[in-house]
């Protein structure tokens, strides 16, 4: 199965895609949040072009699994997305995915100005790869 992963953010949203077998995750792009309408047009277009079997959305939580304001914003985003796209949507809990993505990029020599442009995509890659590495019984569909 092919997946598109979304690391939703209020300024930038990172997108990653899997291979057709659902084994490896790759960065795709970041979508800049201008208006909600423009954002959803770009996102829906990208999803149709990629033709995934399902979507994976990162759900940020704290270390104790408690939810925050951004967690609620992501849940609201998922509700809006499900009205526009008729695909299964899976949640992938995430803690510090952007921080870990930044460390990944620094470790391979990315400079600060380049990191900013690809950070959200790399966070989406981390989210998607974590999802792909889970057994199917561990996956949470909404």
UniProtKB/Swiss-Prot annotation:
SUPFAM superfamilies associated with the record: Ribonuclease H-like
Cysteines engaged in disulfide bonds, as pairs: none
Pfam families assigned to the protein according to its UniProt record, in alphabetical order: RuvX (PF03652)
Stretches that traverse the bilayer: none
Listed GO MF terms: nuclease activity
Claim: Nuclease is one of the keywords in the record: yes
First-tier enzyme category under EC: hydrolase
Coiled-coil residues: none
Localization in the cell: Cytoplasm
One GO process term, biological-process aspect: rRNA 5'-end processing
Family statement drawn from the similarity comment of this UniProt entry: Belongs to the YqgF nuclease family.
Name of the protein in its database record: Putative pre-16S rRNA nuclease
């Amino acid at each position: 199965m092919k997946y598109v992963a979304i690391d939703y953010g209020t300024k930038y949203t990172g997108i990653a895609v899997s291979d057709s077998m659902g084994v490896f995750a790759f960065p795709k792009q970041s979508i800049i949040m201008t208006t909600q309408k423009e954002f959803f047009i770009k996102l829906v277009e990208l999803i149709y072009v990629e033709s995934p079997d399902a979507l994976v959305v990162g759900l940020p939580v704290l270390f104790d699994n408690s939810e925050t304001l951004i967690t609620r914003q992501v849940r609201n985003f998922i509700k809006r997305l499900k009205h526009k796209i008729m695909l299964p949507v899976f949640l992938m809990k995430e803690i510090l995915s952007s921080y870990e993505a930044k460390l990944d990029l620094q470790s391979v020599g990315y400079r600060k100005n380049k990191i900013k442009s690809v950070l959200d995509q790399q966070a989406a890659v981390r989210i998607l790869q974590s999802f792909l590495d889970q057994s199917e019984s561990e996956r949470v569909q909404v």
